[in-house]
């Protein structure tokens, strides 16, 4: 099933997968493999809440074919709390599984992104563009 619904203030795009209104999405991530030009399917990710030096594991998951959490948003707006979070991406494991010859020690092993959530009524999207030698992130929409 493919459809596009568009309105004055909100748009929902569905191309064969379940939809979630953007107003329901509190926290999400998406990883693109810039070496191969594709989503980072199979990469392991961990989500933590952080308080100073203390980090508490919330969830471990493996990215789906689209480079996203297979269960949808990591938090919806109803459950997202104001505070600091950490996403940890297993870059070395992902590229090793893809058969990329990596030096020892590898330049990037795990990429940890620490970020804050100030407004729980907004969508926080944390994309990662990554290769064995570099990464980039930004607050997406």
Q: Model segments located where?
A:
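Short, Lys/Arg-enriched N-terminal segments with co-localized hydrophobic residues
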Residues: 7-24
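Compositionally biased low-complexity segments at domain edges in trafficked proteins
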Residues: 118-141
């Amino acid at each position: 099933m493919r459809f596009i619904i568009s309105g004055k203030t909100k748009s929902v795009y569905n191309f064969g997968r379940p939809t979630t209104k953007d107003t329901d999405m509190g926290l999400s991530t998406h990883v693109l493999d810039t070496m191969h030009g594709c989503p980072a399917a199979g990469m392991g990710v961990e989500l933590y809440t952080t308080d100073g030096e203390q980090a508490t594991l919330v969830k471990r998951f493996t990215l789906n074919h689209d480079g996203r959490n297979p269960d949808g948003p990591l938090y919806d707006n109803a459950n997202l709390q104001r505070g600091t979070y950490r996403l940890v991406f297993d870059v070395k494991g992902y590229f090793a599984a893809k058969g990329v010859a990596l030096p020892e020690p590898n330049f990037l092993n795990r990429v940890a992104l620490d970020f804050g959530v100030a407004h729980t009524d907004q969508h926080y999207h944390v994309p990662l563009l990554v290769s064995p030698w570099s990464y980039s992130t930004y607050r997406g929409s």
